[in-house]
């Protein structure tokens, strides 16, 4: 005999009577659920062992970069060490979940269909939750494969060129466990880790190389000056080492 239950009709706002479990209802099998997760993840990982571009860091810059690369036909994989994608944008400014963009940034918001409001001449605001969740969704739908909870702990170097990433679970790194990593090959690697420049820092620390910068090393960051920082970011978002 079926079990009667009441449910809420979201579309019409009515409480309706329906049927619950019947003898014909599929019984969930925990083993199949586990097999599905393992098989699908294995397929996804195996398909991304060799890519055109590997992005390290899933904040807004990494997401937008990977989105445009994928839209232009490149095979792109993004690795984020944390559980959630989006970097610090979720919190807006000091946990006030609003962001401010200029006219150039608004064009990107418009392309992603993220709503914004004019606040002052040249200053637009947007809800940070809408902004970053939309960036995440549209980046995945553009064809980018995202792996969270994975850290890039080293680089593959061949003949003075970066040719891939050395990867491990973030949990392994946090627990200081001695677990050997795995690798992927990539024609290009993008360091989108923000202030820390983690990928370039590894490159500089472990190899006797000279970067394509003023000093040949990581220049580093300075105290806050928004106008200068925006210009420097635009000028210095470029290749700093082959690959």
Give the location of each predicted region.
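Extreme N-terminal leader/targeting segments of oxidoreductases
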Residues: 2-52
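N-terminal Rossmann-like FAD-binding beta1-loop-alpha1 element of flavoenzymes
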Residues: 51-77
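Conserved Rossmann-like nucleotide-cofactor binding loop
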Residues: 61, 84, 196
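Glycine-rich FAD pyrophosphate-binding loop
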Residues: 70-90
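N-terminal glycine-rich dinucleotide-binding loop that anchors FAD/FMN and/or NAD(P) in oxidoreductases
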Residues: 91-115
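Feature captures the FAD/FMN-dependent oxidoreductase FAD-binding
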Residues: 116-188, 192
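Flavin (primarily FAD) binding-site architecture
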Residues: 191-207
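Flavin-dependent oxidoreductases
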Residues: 202, 206-243
């Amino acid at each position: 005999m079926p079990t009667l239950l009441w449910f809420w009709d979201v579309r019409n706002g009515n409480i309706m009577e329906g049927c619950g479990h019947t003898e014909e209802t599929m019984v969930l099998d925990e083993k199949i659920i586990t097999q599905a997760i393992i098989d699908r993840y294995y397929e996804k990982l195996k398909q991304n062992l060799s890519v055109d571009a590997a992005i390290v860091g899933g904040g807004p810059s990494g997401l937008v970069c990977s989105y445009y690369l994928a839209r232009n036909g490149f095979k792109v994989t993004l690795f984020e060490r944390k559980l959630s994608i989006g970097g610090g944008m979720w919190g807006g400014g000091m946990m006030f979940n609003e962001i401010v963009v200029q006219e150039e940034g608004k064009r990107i918001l418009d392309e992603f269909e993220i709503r914004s409001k004019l606040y002052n001449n040249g200053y637009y605001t947007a809800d940070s939750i809408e902004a970053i969740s939309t960036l995440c969704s549209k980046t995945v739908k553009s064809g980018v494969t995202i792996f969270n909870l994975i850290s890039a702990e080293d680089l593959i170097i061949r003949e003075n060129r970066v040719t891939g990433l050395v990867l491990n679970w973030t949990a392994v790194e946090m627990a200081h466990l001695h677990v050997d990593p795995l690798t992927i090959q990539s024609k290009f690697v993008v360091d989108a880790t923000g202030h820390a420049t983690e990928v370039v820092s590894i490159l500089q620390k472990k190899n006797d190389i000279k970067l394509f910068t003023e000093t040949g090393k990581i220049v580093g960051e300075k105290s806050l000056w928004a106008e200068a920082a925006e210009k420097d970011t635009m000028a210095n978002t470029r290749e700093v080492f082959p690959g």
